[in-house]
Amino acid sequence: MPEGEGGDCGEVPALVPDGEPLREEQRPLKQSLGGSLCRESHWKCLLLTLLIHACGAVVAWCRLATVPRLVLGPEAALARGAGGPPPTYPASPCSDGYLYIPLAFVSLLYLLYLAECWHCHVRSCQAPRTDANTVLALIHRLQQAPPCVWWKATSYHYVRRTRQITRYRNGDAYTTTQVYHERADSRTARGEFDYSAHGVRDVSKELVGLADHAATRLRFTKCFSFGSAEAEASYLTQRARFFSANEGLDDYLEAREGMHLKDVDFRESLMVFADPRSPPWYARAWVFWLVSAATLSWPLRVVAAYGTAHVHYQVEKLFGASSPPPGAVPSGPPLSRVATVDFTELEWHICSNRQLVPSYSEAVVMGASSGAYLRGCQRCRRSVSSNSLPPARPSGPRLPFSRSRLSLGAGGRTTPGVFRSLSGGPLGRRGEDTEPLESPPCYEDALYFPVLIVHGDSGCRGDGQGAL
């Protein structure tokens, strides 16, 4: 399997020529007012706005409202002696300095409000602005770009180190030794999925209707899928072989994987306008700051979210879109035992005992018409064995191997299917002639008590290969 950096994966075969049916259309969707509020609530801006207006209402009440206050002094005593009502005078309810408390709160909340508006403006400016024609050209390049599915394995360990630090206690400084552990990378390996024997095709949707909306927020994602069981089995086998080859080289293993498109600047989000030189009024910077200064930023954001259409465009590559060329040599067997081996001891027992553990992928991807893989082998016999397996899984952190993503049923139930081995032998033919097709066992039973195809010392002569 070729190795290369995630950004430089070497040469890959060209995409399958455009001979596929018409693509499914995808249009931007404009949300309702309630949907826009649920999508982007801007609760921080709303909360700060409500607090500012509440404090402003308190300040206005302190300045405009009046409450009667009793008059103190000789005049009040004379009025009480004459039996009349006590004299009063109108006064502010927030006298004697109490007015400055809500003013201080208003000032602090307004500064926080402006900071939140600045962060919102910065986030909105991170998405580049462009027009519909540029986006359509970018999507065309994304559809034509060949994919690269890469893996990266980093072996590392921790080194115990010491350093001198200064601490302070009761005003006195003293030096002490601190022990810490630092990560040290010992080896880094990179690889990619070789799909030259299976082909690849772009099955992304066709984006239409961008020019029908004044503003559209476009979000890009990328993924890949498999159009045939052989392509998926090849991917899982190559991936498992790569990580198993890099396992055990050091104390720990960090595994990373991903996909990128070659020769294309992939952006996760774009802001599309019908005319970028004259965007809508709610998308202009001076309008945003003018309205924000008047503490009306939250209503403006609601209007902008309601007037902006949204679309999530997914670039999808389909592996196994074409049959392999006549002269193509497969990179490996259709399925390998590394796709199901889950610890090193089991791999060692399999190699020493010359036994092959049937894969879960074999149980599902093989149909009744896949008898071409089953070749005659008179020396093969079917047996159920658990003596060659370790008693339990080893403890400690370890890289989990890739398992097949094919579904075998929910809740631990098995689905009816054909459970056959690709190693050859009359097992499949006997099952068709004399016995009904049996369902695969649950995963734990197959892991600890697998069905083994045991070969003799001279190997299988039916397929012309030696013992595994």
Swiss-Prot record:
<dbReference type="GO" id="GO:0016020">
    <property type="term" value="C:membrane"/>
</dbReference>
<keyword id="KW-0472">Membrane</keyword>
<keyword id="KW-0812">Transmembrane</keyword>
<protein>
    <recommendedName>
        <fullName>Transmembrane protein 151A</fullName>
    </recommendedName>
</protein>
<keyword id="KW-1133">Transmembrane helix</keyword>
<dbReference type="GO" id="GO:0005783">
    <property type="term" value="C:endoplasmic reticulum"/>
</dbReference>
<dbReference type="GO" id="GO:0030425">
    <property type="term" value="C:dendrite"/>
</dbReference>
<dbReference type="InterPro" id="IPR026767">
    <property type="entry name" value="Tmem151"/>
</dbReference>
<feature type="region of interest" description="Disordered">
    <location>
        <begin position="1"/>
        <end position="20"/>
    </location>
</feature>
<dbReference type="GO" id="GO:0030315">
    <property type="term" value="C:T-tubule"/>
</dbReference>
<comment type="similarity">
    <text>Belongs to the TMEM151 family.</text>
</comment>
<feature type="transmembrane region" description="Helical">
    <location>
        <begin position="98"/>
        <end position="118"/>
    </location>
</feature>
<keyword id="KW-0966">Cell projection</keyword>
<keyword id="KW-0256">Endoplasmic reticulum</keyword>
<dbReference type="GO" id="GO:0005789">
    <property type="term" value="C:endoplasmic reticulum membrane"/>
</dbReference>
<feature type="transmembrane region" description="Helical">
    <location>
        <begin position="45"/>
        <end position="65"/>
    </location>
</feature>
<feature type="region of interest" description="Disordered">
    <location>
        <begin position="384"/>
        <end position="438"/>
    </location>
</feature>
<dbReference type="Pfam" id="PF14857">
    <property type="entry name" value="TMEM151"/>
</dbReference>
<dbReference type="GO" id="GO:0030424">
    <property type="term" value="C:axon"/>
</dbReference>
